[in-house]
């Protein structure tokens, strides 16, 4: 079984630790995309990778952040997965109540910590393999090459560093492709804050999919809300995290 790990990289020290020298990635093909000079949006790098591959390739593609660290053997975990679905370790789902209230939930689990390894903690809720979600977090998306080629799936390059995997999931859903959780032990070395660009990119996704209720795993963002409430939801979650860290 062929597995290709694709990462857009600016911090090669972090990439080496989390991906290239990680024993749980042994046997995988590494496809790092050097982004130190261009600082292009991550979808640009991912799409350039897809354009470079054979249309007949038979492989699992693991699109992941440079600071996403698998903690169990990828090859063993991808055996017998349904090639007709998208897969990821952590995502989000919503339940709409009374047509207006959106109940939000993280689905799947991942450890996360700061860049220096401090404040390590588990987030999300454990679920069984194949549990459906609406969207995955951008830290990791697993998809078979045949599904991408057959459905002409690509990443939206307007979304530079946020929500590009969420967008990918929604676009795939419109083609009848489900997003499902693969329980996978991993650590995301990124406890960063929400940047101002996030709100512009979130507005873009809302306009692109006006009838979709999408969820942003890192920020509690729900499609369809007034912008002031979306921004408030981010600030509330950030406050709760700071309180927990004290």
Task: Label the predicted regions.
Residues 180-205:
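Active-site donor/metal-binding and catalytic loop motifs
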Residues 196-215, 219-246:
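Non-catalytic, C-terminal membrane-associated alpha-helical segments of glycosyltransferases
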Residues 5-27:
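Short, well-formed alpha-helical segments that are part of the catalytic scaffolds
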Residues 120-143:
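A recurrent flexible, glycine/aromatic-enriched loop bordering the glycosyltransferase active site
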Residues 58-69:
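Short beta-strand-to-loop acidic/aromatic patch adjacent to the donor-nucleotide binding site
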Residues 39-53:
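Glycine-rich, basic loop-to-helix element that forms the pyrophosphate-binding segment
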Residues 69, 73-109:
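Conserved donor NDP-sugar-binding/catalytic core segment of glycosyltransferases
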Residues 135-138, 150-170, 179-188:
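Donor nucleotide-sugar recognition loop
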């Amino acid at each position: 079984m062929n597995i290709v790990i694709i990462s857009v990289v600016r911090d090669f020290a972090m990439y080496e630790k989390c991906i290239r020298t990680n024993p749980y990635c042994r046997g995988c093909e590494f496809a790092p995309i050097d982004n130190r000079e261009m600082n292009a949006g991550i979808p640009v790098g991912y799409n350039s990778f897809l354009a470079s591959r054979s249309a007949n390739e038979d492989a699992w593609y693991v699109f992941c952040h440079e600071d996403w660290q698998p903690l169990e053997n990828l090859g063993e975990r991808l055996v017998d997965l349904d090639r007709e679905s998208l897969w990821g370790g952590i995502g989000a789902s919503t339940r709409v109540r009374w047509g207006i209230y959106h109940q939000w939930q993280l689905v799947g689990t991942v450890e996360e910590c700061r860049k220096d390894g401090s404040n390590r903690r588990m987030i999300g809720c454990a679920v069984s393999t194949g549990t459906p979600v609406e969207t995955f977090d951008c830290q990791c998306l697993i998809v078979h090459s045949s599904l991408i080629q057959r459905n002409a799936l690509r990443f939206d390059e307007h979304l530079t560093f946020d929500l590009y995997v969420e967008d990918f999931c929604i676009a795939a859903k419109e083609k009848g492709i489900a997003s499902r959780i693969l329980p996978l032990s991993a650590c995301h070395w990124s406890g960063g804050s929400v940047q101002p660009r996030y709100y512009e990119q979130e507005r873009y996704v809302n306009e692109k999919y006006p009838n979709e209720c999408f969820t942003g795993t890192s920020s509690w963002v729900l499609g369809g809300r007034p912008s002031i409430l979306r921004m408030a939801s981010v600030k509330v979650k950030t406050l709760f995290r700071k309180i927990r860290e004290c």
